[in-house]
Structures are given as C-alpha cells and as structure tokens.
Amino acid sequence: MANTGRFLLGTSGWSYAEWVAVFYPTSTESKLGFYSKIFPTVEIDSTFYAFPKEGMVIGWDRYSPRNFVFNAKIPQTITHERLEALGKPIEEELDRFANLMLPLNNSGKLGCLLIQLPPRYKFDSNHLEEFLSLLPHGFKYAIEFRHKSWLRDETWRILSKYNVAYTIVDEPLLPPEVHVTADFAYIRWHGRGQRPWYDYHYTEKELADWLPKVKEVEGSVKTTYGYFNNHFHGYAVENGLSILKMLDKLTPAQEEALKRARTNLRQAKEKPVGLGEFTRGGEDRAKLVDLLGTIMGETRLARSFTIPDEDVKIKEANLKTIDAKIRDYTLKMDMASKTIVHDCGDWERAIETRQLCKHIGKVLLTIPEQVALTWVSAIHENLDAWKFQQPRK
C-alpha cells in the first residue's frame, strides 16, 4: 500500500523540570510554547491522574499552534476504579471528561482520547463491548491493554467494529505486535526498564528495529500517532527525534533540538551529580537523595534542603503510613492504597507532572532513612499506580 498517511510523533507529557537541562533552554519560558515549536503533537498524561480544570484545557488550546494535535488519557478513576461496575456512574464520568475536552475537539486540535487499562483487566469480550458502547460520540478513541489475554482475533474484531485503535506498544508486559483496528493508529514507547519502565534510553538499534513497523502502520491509515513515554532525564525527546531522523522526517528545528539534546545528555552523564554535597552520611543517604532527585527534579529537591528542620512535625512514620505537618501544610501517605494527600500551592502543579514537591521531599529526608528509602523506592518503581491528591474540601 502506498505510504500516504501522516506520522505525528511527540512525547507523553511536556512539563518535566529535568528537561530544562536537556530540551528546554530556560526554566522560565513556556514549556508548551517551546515544545510545540519542535513537536507537532503531545500526549496529555496529567489527565490520567486528575480531571483537568476547564481553564487549563482552554489554555492548551489558546497557547498552541493552529495545527498542533493533543491526545489525552482518560482519567484513571474511570479506567481503573469504575471499570468493573459499568453503568450510570462511569457513563457520567465519561461525559464529564468528554465535555472538558470539547475546546480542543471543537478547534480540531484533539486527535483522540486514550483508554489505558490496568494489568488486572483480562479478556472479557462482552464487558469490553459494553464499555465501548458507553463512550461519548464525536470523539476518536485508542485503547491500551496491559494483559496478554487480549491479544486475539476477537479483540481486533470488537475494536474494528467501534473504530477504536489498538495501541501498539514497546514495553515489558506485551509484545510489540502491530494490529490496525481503526482509521488511525497509535504507538507508545514506554521503555524497557524494570525500576520503572520509563527510566530507559533506547539504543539506535532498538529504534531501528521499529522502522519497518512504523512504515507498515503509516501506510495503512490516514494518521499515525507515536509517543515516547520514557521521560526520565529527557530520554523521550532524544529518542523521538532520533527515530524521526532515521525515517528522514526531521525538520531543521528538530535537527537542532536533537543535537542539543544529545550534547546535554552526554554532558550530564560525564559530570558528577549536582547534589553531591547533600549525599553525605552513607550509602543509604546517597541512594535516597538520588531517587528523590529522579521523582522530584533537582530544583525541588534542592529547595527541600532549605526548609528548617523545626518546620517539620512528624506524627507518624512507618512502612504503612506517614502523617506529618510542614509549616502550615499537611501530608498523609498510605502505602496500601498508594495515596499521597498534600495541600501546598506547588503540589497542584506537581500533580500535573507526577513529581513530589519540596515539602514532601523534606519529610522524606527527615524520617529514618530506611523507612524513607522503602517509600521512595515504592513510588519510583511504580509511579503510575500512585494517586497524587489534594485534601477534599
């Protein structure tokens, strides 16, 4: 088949503090504004963790180029918490999210809504059909399975019936099989790391192995969306631009961004960790600071060290629960439910980027190191499973 389709490639999310040293020239410039000059599309990852505010969606529309394309993840309250019990509650939540995304849909900037299912969700054709029948009309959808039982002909038949795109993945759980089930295609590169997936830098050979698959898909549909989700350290930017270069699709602006990303990543690997002065105190302390830097960003972590010890009051800190007060703010963490509830002003922004704020960092630096290491390792290894929340008012 002739290769006539569009291939729009970007990253999963764009507002990562650690990308400033690799991709973004400064920390003050609008990240979406700069990002949209380099990439034609982005996957909105923050909507998976919380419903966006109406003004935020309007802002995405207003401050992005006319032909820019967003794809948004459906909130996990729908796909993970309400999925088993289909009915009016989940239908209302779907309608609520769809209505919030209308500004992007009406302006032609919304490609599709992504349904990311939990690993526990196993093959059930009747349940899947019932769920797909509840999806609001007027939108396109892609669906990502996390269990191998879905890899069968019946699944492709159902998805084709509803024109829902099967999400082709590169990840540890499922094989990178190519299945086209809609008039567009969706590819996600998650990384192949173990602790977690996303902390992974694809090699040139690993990317080259994907070229035949990308070309096959691109020639079968009108539009192919591709997103690199290995966002740690800015790897997603470099890998995404690298595969575009291999496909001979790199623009001059992207070529310059790729050179800058490669140079900055190389220099980052060569220089010592910038927070070395805070790692004194043994191997556990060094590991704790290193892990915190990964899930906070060095700027927020550095600010954690500036908070006086007397500003922190620890009510409880063990392997099950953390209950603390930092200045006028509260923090409650629960290991069993994987929940973090906090109320500082920066926390609302941190929720969007899936990072811890300086106050949480300070608490984790204050409690016993072995306890803190257990918590930070659990968050680092399974970031997607954790719920970042504000107190209910």
Predicted regions and their residues:
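Residues lining hydrophobic/aromatic ligand-binding pockets adjacent to catalytic sites
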Residues: 1-283
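Long, low-complexity, compositionally biased intrinsically disordered regions
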Residues: 271-393
